[in-house]
């Protein structure tokens, strides 16, 4: 009887130890496989991806993480194909760079952790009513939303005599629509006439921009991936017509704007990477992680300001001569 009890006890102990070791192995893998789906190539998204990768390398070590970077070339259907391949390969985490990439990943898996970045409003992007800052489930990330009320204030600060503001944006991007609604509300409260000028894709940007520039004192371009991919087209038109653009983010401002209140997308991506490291190493559960933000700062494009004869206040920093154009 004693021998039987000892055998059972020994077996139980061995089983417990085996499970314990198995748990340790799963919680700290030799190499983490991370899939990155980026909507399109442009300065802001590129910087976010760079920051994300660097943060994971800094936190886990270069030999501990393997990246599979895929670019969807501004095709939402390609986003779905890319993230489904990540799911089939059973990657440890998916980083979705921009709203269509996040939406595709959200629809592709409910088990693999998904972190979004360069996403403006998660509630709008994922159709969550009463969004409280936490997506829950297997999704979290970072937002590139700058204070929209302060962006509206920037327009009136720089151009106090402006009576007509045109808002130029892509109608196919839900986050752009959200920003347009908010900024329009803030500007109308200042008794400014606001008109919307929307394009469905890059093919009609030139004609819509020309119309906007012909009927506006100032143009506002929100954080918008399609606009960010074609700032040269916008810039050539507005400079020729001498109509200033206030941009929702830095890459658009570098290409065609005079000023912006914008976040740094490298910092945004880096914060996303820090979140990824905490998830992969088991330090945090993604279902409890709130959407994170980074601080915005006032910046101006000296090159375009000089061309238009615009002087900005001293609290704006010069973003330099780097230009991200089509």
Region spans (language model):
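C-terminal motif of bacterial Sec signal peptides marking the signal peptidase cleavage site
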Residues: 19-23
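Extracytoplasmic "Venus flytrap"
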Residues: 31-53, 59, 68-78, 172, ...
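An alpha-beta-alpha
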Residues: 34-36, 52, 140-187, 288-305
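Short, solvent-exposed amphipathic alpha-helices that sit
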Residues: 44-60, 147-151, 175-193, 233, ...
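Beta-alpha junction/loop-to-helix N-cap segments that form part of ligand/metal-binding clefts
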Residues: 70-130, 221-248
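Hydrophobic alpha-helical segments within soluble ligand-binding/sensing domains
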Residues: 122-164, 263-284
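Pocket-lining segment of extracytoplasmic ligand-binding domains
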Residues: 174-243, 249
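Hinge/cleft segment of the Venus flytrap/periplasmic-binding protein
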Residues: 278-326
